[in-house]
Amino acid sequence: MGSRAGTGAIASATCTTRVEWVDTDASGHHHNTAVIRWVEECEARMFRDLGLLEHVAQAPRVRLEVNFRAPLHFGQEITTELRLERLGERSMSFSFRVWGGVRDEEPGGAPPRPAADGLLVTACVPPGATVAAPWPEHLRRTLLAAGGTPPAP
């Protein structure tokens, strides 16, 4: 995971993995739902690295947009980039990109290409609650500090 101060992101993470057999469908390339799982894995890693893992269980998805741009194949190395773009009082918005690199069976291969990008919005719903609530102050401070943005007074 890497924080990116000065890039406009409040906080960010970059995760690398491979397309596994379970990620593919009958057409021989990744199943669309795999993109969502890779994004959520990167989100969990970002919060774990910031010491905020408990947050993940209280942040249901309220909006998800995915643009599928290119297929990814079994064994292919991929990189997921996640950026926290907006931290609201009760929700937060992420942008993401999933990049595919060189397929193992293609020697000399092509340069990485974007396979998917999109937007993910989560809301703060504490355990036992049924409606959104404000994010805890310690979470806001930690996220803002990760991106080099000072907390609002």
Report the location of each language-model feature.
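Short alpha-helix capping/helix-loop boundary micro-motifs
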Residues: R63-N67
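Short, basic/aromatic beta-hairpin or loop at an interaction surface
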Residues: L50-A59
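Residues that form generic nucleotide/phosphate-binding pockets
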Residues: W38, L50, T142-A146
